[in-house]
Amino acid sequence: MAGNTIGQLFRVTTFGESHGIALGCIIDGCPPGLSLTEKDMQHDLDRRRPGTSKYTTQRREADEVKILSGVFEGQTTGTSIGLLIENTDQRSKDYSNIQDLFRPGHADYTYHQKYGVRDYRGGGRSSARETAMRVAAGAVAKKYLKQIHGIEVRAYLSQMGAVKIDKVDWEQIEQNAFFCPDADKVDAFDELIRKLKKEGDSIGAKLTVVASNVPVGLGEPVFDRLDADVAHSLMSINAVKGVEIGDGFEVIEQRGSQHRDEMTLDGFKTNHAGGILGGISSGQNIVAHIALKPTSSITVPGETITSKGESAEVITKGRHDPCVGIRAVPIAEAMLAITLMDHLLRHRGQNADVVTTTPKI
């Protein structure tokens, strides 16, 4: 299986399955001298890990990360950073009834057709359990970006089902289990999740991820445009079915006179482009939105087929999220941070000596 690595200069490779012994990743390209301990990654891992609230899957994993290499006396050495998280709460028996079934909406059928064999326990490699290592690697990138360049990457839940937020208060995001920036919508989210759990169903969501204090110049035209790579990294997250940069699909109804981000000596007047122009960062906030589908791991009976070519009914047992968008918030942050880290190192390598007299706004 290829496709387990993302990035060019800051490269992240993950491995492991949902019910395997452990998950792991290798980070190549992290500059030396960055102070780093397991604690630096644990905060974001705790935000993502299962079993932390009544609104998410009750699989209980400590998700305690171990640094295997690349760090000496609390500092990165510039060599490969090896990270490992052990799986401790697998309940593979929950999946024994579906080992020959293809769950609709999941990767069971496509994995089986592509490889001729699949790990049916919790989805194996296709499970969102894999994203724990992305979050760990993303925490390294987030620390470097913030500590060395003052870049901050944050995300929040902006919509669940038909319930949309009306305002953004960054102080509220960590005050509730939904990563919701609008305190007035928390009860509505709570009511929706309770209803879904009672019905055995699930719902989709929309997340917004923002990077602030990003310098001008990140991005490599034409095929490695920053927005193209941001879309690629966010689209690689499990259950993501759509990505918007800036105003996204709203531009369809906008006019050029409305959409263009006019400039003054004091700065840009608007940010419809989401902080990226011509595939290169403009110095404004980078803003992206992702749409996540409702999980198909539900107890509502559904029609499917077996690997032996028989018709069957499927009811997914096990422990699952009624809305995968909740725990995807730190994952979205991680993927944007990894992409920005990679492009920052690439920009530094090629353009560190570029001098321009053009004022920065």
From Swiss-Prot:
Keyword line: Amino-acid biosynthesis, Aromatic amino acid biosynthesis, FAD, Flavoprotein, FMN, Lyase, NADP
Enzyme Commission number(s) from the entry: 4.2.3.5
UniProt xrefs under Pfam families: Chorismate_synt
Region (Disordered): 38-58
CDD domains for this protein: Chorismate_synthase
Cellular component, GO annotation: cytosol
Bias (Basic and acidic residues): 38-49
Record's signal peptide: none
Substrates-to-products reaction catalysed: 5-O-(1-carboxyvinyl)-3-phosphoshikimate = chorismate + phosphate
Record-listed FMN binding positions: R125, S126, S127, N238, A239, G278, K293, P294, T295, S296, S297, R319
Cofactor section: FMNH2
Comment on bound cofactor: Reduced FMN (FMNH(2)).
Biological process per Gene Ontology, one example term: chorismate biosynthetic process
One Gene Ontology MF term: chorismate synthase activity
Residues that bind NADP(+): R48
Pathway: Metabolic intermediate biosynthesis; chorismate biosynthesis; chorismate from D-erythrose 4-phosphate and phosphoenolpyruvate: step 7/7
Similarity comment: Belongs to the chorismate synthase family.
Subunit (UniProt): Homotetramer.
Protein name: Chorismate synthase
Organism this protein belongs to: Photobacterium profundum (strain SS9)
Lineage per the UniProt record: Bacteria, Pseudomonadati, Pseudomonadota, Gammaproteobacteria, Vibrionales
